[in-house]
């Protein structure tokens, strides 16, 4: 940060820190604004060391000014910062950014008047728009585009891969260029040949449209006059550099370079849309995303939209508020439609921070607690817990204080526990297994009524089945253990209900 902050020192730094950001505002320029401006210049492939001198600031302003019409708020803020820095280097006293812009406009007007006066006297040696310059004899000649400019353009394409900021960068680097210079810039792009093919198709369509709207006049060209350019001439394929310079410097001039650049920008817009398929309608702020990051994503996608400036302004006024998260949306609506982005930023500093996250977490936990309470209220009757050991309700066998019952609680046999029991039948309170093989519990009469149908005749040819033998044997055993009961009196003693 030390190298970035060394742009101003001593008295210049003191004057810098006394200038207000806005007329009537409270915030002033600080050292961090210089650091931010140097980083933004590197992002736009410009040299940050130019900020250290007056002439360097002037060159930066000449490159940034053409892109202001289609640039974002960040580009405009960078331009305003360089203007204030230029005033500090010049020693021009200003109070705020607006006064610095007025001083720059006055200086530009004076420069134009001096150039016009020198041209009228015939003693002008000031060059016109680069790359068409005047030689020592006063003739307008073409100066080829510099390798440094081509290197900056290639670096931008390689790093950004046709993101929205490539278009204003192309406009800044191709200011005043001829069609031949523009073709040189396009030919230096090595990769992205699919995008280059799309660009060629757009250029061919625009050239055909130009030929349709500007038909060739019949007859030969009068002597001393230049022929009218065709679409292929504007694209630089059928015209020489002398013809291009002649069209651009004739009276009235035919700006073939600007026309060709406009065609290229149309193609670049389509390429940017292809490389940025996200729609502006899909840009929504996350619940934990800061407002600054959301605005950056919003404007980056907005630059890739194929729409007029009026439509983009409507998108900014409507969608920026509509797609914000509930916290930021409430703040935006409270600020009203006249609020600026610079004034909105302090209002959203707490959103997404630790305190805000803690408050959101507390609200979420409170809502979850309320929902759990509501669910408990609508639950059914409480399930009754019963002990397997003593048979009483209100506790389980693990917490039972009664003596532990021996044997398995399921089948009644000893030697294993209920969880390891392999017997599918369960013992009832009389000790009999349930369900029994006969399908009747032990506290019911074990003998079934005999059928009224006559028995099957047996001629002695069939042996008694083993299953019938086992059934007879089990009946005899049960009759010995429990004699046949005709009433419950023998089981329960004197039962008044059985009398």
Curated annotation (Swiss-Prot):
Reported function: Matrix protein p17 targets Gag and Gag-Pol polyproteins to the plasma membrane via a multipartite membrane binding signal, that includes its myristoylated N-terminus. Also mediates nuclear localization of the preintegration complex. Implicated in the release from host cell mediated by Vpu.
Keywords, ordered alphabetically: Capsid protein, Host cell membrane, Host cytoplasm, Host membrane, Host nucleus, Host-virus interaction, Lipoprotein, Membrane, Metal-binding, Myristate, Phosphoprotein, Repeat, RNA-binding, Viral budding, Viral budding via the host ESCRT complexes, Viral nucleoprotein, Viral release from host cell, Virion, Zinc, Zinc-finger
PROSITE patterns documented for this protein: ZF_CCHC
Nuclear export signal (motif): residue ranges: 16-22
GO molecular function ontology, one term from the record: zinc ion binding
Post-translational modification: Capsid protein p24 is phosphorylated. Specific enzymatic cleavages by the viral protease yield mature proteins. The polyprotein is cleaved during and after budding, this process is termed maturation.
GO cellular component, one term: host cell cytoplasm
Gene: gag
Segments of this protein annotated with the region Disordered: 435-499
Any one of the GO BP annotations: viral budding via host ESCRT complex
Bias kind Basic and acidic residues: ranges: 460-479
Family annotation (PANTHER family): ENDOGENOUS RETROVIRUS GROUP K MEMBER 24 GAG POLYPROTEIN-RELATED, IGE-BINDING PROTEIN
Notes concerning its domains: Late-budding domains (L domains) are short sequence motifs essential for viral particle budding. They recruit proteins of the host ESCRT machinery (Endosomal Sorting Complex Required for Transport) or ESCRT-associated proteins. p6-gag contains one L domain: a PTAP/PSAP motif, which interacts with the UEV domain of TSG101.
Protein's recorded name: Gag polyprotein
Organism in which the protein naturally occurs: Simian immunodeficiency virus (isolate MB66)
Motif LYPX(n)L motif: where in chain: 481-491
């Amino acid at each position: 940060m030390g190298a970035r902050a060394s742009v101003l020192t001593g008295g210049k730094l003191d004057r810098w820190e006394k200038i207000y950001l806005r007329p009537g505002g409270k915030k002033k320029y600080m050292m961090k604004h210089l650091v931010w401006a140097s980083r933004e210049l590197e992002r736009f492939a410009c040299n940050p060391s130019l900020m250290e001198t007056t002439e360097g600031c002037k060159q930066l302003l000449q490159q940034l000014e053409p892109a202001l019409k289609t640039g974002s708020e960040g580009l405009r803020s960078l331009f305003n910062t360089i203007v204030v820095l230029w005033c500090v280097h010049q020693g021009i006293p200003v109070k705020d950014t607006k006064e610095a812009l007025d001083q720059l406009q006055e200086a530009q007007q004076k420069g134009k008047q001096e150039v016009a006066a020198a041209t009228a006297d015939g003693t002008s040696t000031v060059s016109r728009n680069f790359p068409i310059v005047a030689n020592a004899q006063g003739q307008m000649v073409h100066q080829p585009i510099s390798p440094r400019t081509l290197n900056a353009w290639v670096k931008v394409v390689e790093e950004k891969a046709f993101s929205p900021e490539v278009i204003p960068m192309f406009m800044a680097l191709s200011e005043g260029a001829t069609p031949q210079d523009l073709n040189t810039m396009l030919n230096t792009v090595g990769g992205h040949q699919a995008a280059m093919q799309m660009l060629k198709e757009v250029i061919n369509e625009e050239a055909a449209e130009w030929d349709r709207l500007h038909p060739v006049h019949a007859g030969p060209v009068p002597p001393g006059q230049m022929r009218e350019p065709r679409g292929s001439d504007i694209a630089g394929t059928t015209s020489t550099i002398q013809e291009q310079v002649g069209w651009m410097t004739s009276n009235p001039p035919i700006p073939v370079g600007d026309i060709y650049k406009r065609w290229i920008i149309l193609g670049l817009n389509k390429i940017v849309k292809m490389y940025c398929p996200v729609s502006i309608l899909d840009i929504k702020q996350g619940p934990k995303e800061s407002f600054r990051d959301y605005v950056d994503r919003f404007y980056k996608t907005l630059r890739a939209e194929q729409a007029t400036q009026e439509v983009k302004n409507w998108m900014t006024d409507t969608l920026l508020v509509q797609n914000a998260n509930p916290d930021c949306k409430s703040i935006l609506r409270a600020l009203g439609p006249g609020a600026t982005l610079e004034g909105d930023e302090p209002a959203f500093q707490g959103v997404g921070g630790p305190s805000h996250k803690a408050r959101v977490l507390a609200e979420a936990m409170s809502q979850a607690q309320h929902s759990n309470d509501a669910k408990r209220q609508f639950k059914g009757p409480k399930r009754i817990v019963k002990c397997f050991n003593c048979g009483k309700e209100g506790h389980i066998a693990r917490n039972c204080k009664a003596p532990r019952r021996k044997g398995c609680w399921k089948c009644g046999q000893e030697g294993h526990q209920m969880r390891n029991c392999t017997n599918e039948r369960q013992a009832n309170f009389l000790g009999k297994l349930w369900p029994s093989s006969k399908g009747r519990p032990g506290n019911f009469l074990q003998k079934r009524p005999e059928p009224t149908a006559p028995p099957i005749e047996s001629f002695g040819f069939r042996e008694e089945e083993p299953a019938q033998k086992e059934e007879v044997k089990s009946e005899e055993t049960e009759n010995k253990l429990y004699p046949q009961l005709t009433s419950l009196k023998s089981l329960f003693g004197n039962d008044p209900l059985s009398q």
